[in-house]
UniProtKB/Swiss-Prot annotation:
Record gene name: rimM
Annotated source species: Deinococcus radiodurans (strain ATCC 13939 / DSM 20539 / JCM 16871 / CCUG 27074 / LMG 4051 / NBRC 15346 / NCIMB 9279 / VKM B-1422 / R1)
GO CC terms in record: cytosol; ribosome
Record bears the keyword rRNA processing: yes
Record's subunit section: Binds ribosomal protein uS19.
Superkingdom of the source species: Bacteria
Protein name in UniProt: Ribosome maturation factor RimM
Transmembrane segments: none
Function per UniProt: An accessory protein needed during the final step in the assembly of 30S ribosomal subunit, possibly for assembly of the head region. Essential for efficient processing of 16S rRNA. May be needed both before and after RbfA during the maturation of 16S rRNA. It has affinity for free ribosomal 30S subunits but not for 70S ribosomes.
Amino acid sequence: MTRPEASGPPDATRLGHLLGPHGVQGGIKLYVLGDPAQVLALKRVYVESRGWLSLRRAEGMPPNLVLYLAGVSSREGAEELRGLQVYATDAELPDLEEGTFYYHDLRGLEVYGAGGERLGTVSDVMDAGHQDLLVVDYGGGTSFVPLQAPYVEVPLAGGKPGAVHLTADAPAGLIGPEPGEEDGAAES
């Protein structure tokens, strides 16, 4: 699995990625990273490498959505968008319920261990099927931490995440080089 590069507009939230065509009239399935209801009210979305596209309509197709985008009117046109990331600006998204946050709010946060030691910095949140992963950069590389794991805590300060904390239940060596690696390179 490769890490998707951030290619959306500034101050935007990644909504998900396009899975492939639905029907013959340009519908395309969207794998949604959050609450699909937040996408239904949007008037436009930003599609990676294509820019802003008007959202003609969106339909629920649990667990995904089907989007009908301006300028995409055929199955072939929808196929060209397969795999691309989809974004919306924060200002266009609905207000969140208290105690919740957008994943992009985690980018740049420090990650701390149970003893308060700094372990790294969140550079991205990656969808990996049924589990979302924090991409954590540490001094010598990158580690992936399951966001929904019971040992991951994201306390809110002023309604926004302030840091990521791993509890004492976190597996040893979760962040850092794999066993047998030295200075980021595997030994042979």
